[in-house]
């Protein structure tokens, strides 16, 4: 626009000059009309021309000034169009270079604490218009750059220690290491002290270690007497390094003067817990080794934030449980040490505030910790996620139980009236029915061609976790089956929850089993119940049967109490292909202990079934377990919920029936469909605890 403005002014000046010269030339007939002979009077025409040209000159001058200013403003803002991710959020390292626009001269808007009883309504209001008010609130936060200096971080010797050039610790809050002899600036690490809700320096927010800063990282952990490390990034995301692996996979490794030995590693569906024994390797050191726990949250997606805050809340509780009261600051890091790190710290602090004051003040707390480390909580989506986590915590609280308290809890549930005039168990289940069914995420299942493949049109998979089949050449919609991936206790997508096959979907069923390498099928319905078809018989009674490119041959059929165990030899042969046939053994566990109406009378049969399935999985490699009843929700959800709950009881001595079922309902609608089925989950857990000693082989 800039070249345009001088050109415009030049042409205007030329026009003005030409107009002035016209007074000295003889006008033509087409220019003038006169009733008198001779030239016109210049005194009458010149003022008229001036009055016409002056407004035009003023207008052009204003336009030129506007375009010049607009051009300058555009230069001041980084063009981020090429850096946008699919959900519109900039990735951490990209955002770090975005220039901040100047604040409104009227000053930042004030946001007040929110009483917890108003939290749900406030979130609803802020979420309207695509979270417009959340964005406004987030954009009103101070950046934190103005309040501090960064002299140490910007020293030439320290620049290579920073993962990102403009994510730096303030001088007044940086973690200071002991100075190493002969090494200038060896007291520097990109890490900052961060306060908790009431506790000063409760956390250390750090960047993910680089290869050249790993030694400094462990030196910091030792010198600060930290017993807990919280890791909120994966080592690589989208093929880019986010954090250097600063621990050995097994055995011991020495980082600088700190020896780190792996003591234990427990992998769960949302996070991994590693235990390290660390000890300084100095000639005159006689200090005792220390135990350090690393809790690595693995469910933060490459883009945006977790789909639900449930996993983060469970993770945060585990951090609180494992961190000793006498220990130094909790070390929290992601990649840059501001976005996910800040989100975690704010949720922790606001949960403490709920306990203490029954209110939250997210805006004030984020503003405060940004004075300690700039850009903490890096995106408006992370900021919104904090509120969602706090609402989840307020609405549902902590429903986790120790196994020793289960019996007392059940007595409370069955005997306590609520303000809804229902017993506690019914009220707990009522909360589950409030989990919203996300119909906007069911587009594929609601296509006309796919609706014909559903037994119950209300029970179809969400798009984000549906099981996808290979597309048949030239045949639309052949990648669809009414089946959802469901997380297990230790492994994501451990189950495939599906309906009982229909006659025209049985080929898709076997394609799913084959393509996803499922060696285990759990069937929780009869082929017919109450004279109604519940499931097409998708296996042969004897010999073999072929569905599409897959042949199923029955090899054995045995009945053990209430479970039929059938072994199938499954053969895949692609027509016209030169490759050899592929074969695989698949075992079906057909549970006959579920009555046509209601629930099983006792839990032992379900415990036996889960134990048998787990044993089969250990022998075949833990590929997805195919689970179905008729619609793929009620009994299917109950089996999966109990599998996850009992696995946790064995591993941790803890259970959370409510959150286990709630998590399933977020992955497939109507999982654990009735109050009876929900109560049955509690009953089976109680039976399992009572007879636990008889099931040592369950492990």
Curated annotation (Swiss-Prot):
Reactions this protein catalyses: O-phospho-L-tyrosyl-[protein] + H2O = L-tyrosyl-[protein] + phosphate
Gene source species: Rattus norvegicus (Rat)
Post-translational modification summary for this protein: A catalytically active cytoplasmic form (p65) is produced by proteolytic cleavage of either isoform 1, isoform 2 or isoform 3. Isoform 1 and isoform 2 are phosphorylated on tyrosine residues by tyrosine kinase Neu.
Low complexity bias (residue ranges): 20-36
UniProt key word Glycoprotein: yes
Protein name: Receptor-type tyrosine-protein phosphatase epsilon
Gene for this chain: Ptpre
Tissues in which the UniProt entry reports expression: Isoform 1 is highly expressed in the brain, lung, spleen and testis. Isoform 2 is highly expressed in thymus, spleen and lung. Isoform 1 and isoform 2 are expressed in primary hepatocytes.
Residue positions the entry lists as glycosylated: 23, 31
Highest taxon in the source lineage: Eukaryota
Record keyword Cytoplasm present: yes
Domain notes from UniProt: The tyrosine-protein phosphatase 2 domain (D2) mediates dimerization. The extreme N- and C- termini of the D2 domain act to inhibit dimerization and removal of these sequences increases dimerization and inhibits enzyme activity.
Signal peptide: 1-22
GO BP of this protein: cell surface receptor protein tyrosine phosphatase signaling pathway; negative regulation of insulin receptor signaling pathway; regulation of mast cell activation; signal transduction
Residue ranges that the UniProt entry lists as topological domain Cytoplasmic: 69-699
InterPro entries: Prot-tyrosine_phosphatase-like, Protein-Tyr_Phosphatase, PTP_cat, Tyr_Pase_AS, Tyr_Pase_cat, Tyr_Pase_dom, Tyr_Pase_rcpt_a/e-type
Region (Disordered): 20-41
Membrane-side (Extracellular) residue stretches: 23-47
Family per record: Belongs to the protein-tyrosine phosphatase family. Receptor class 4 subfamily.
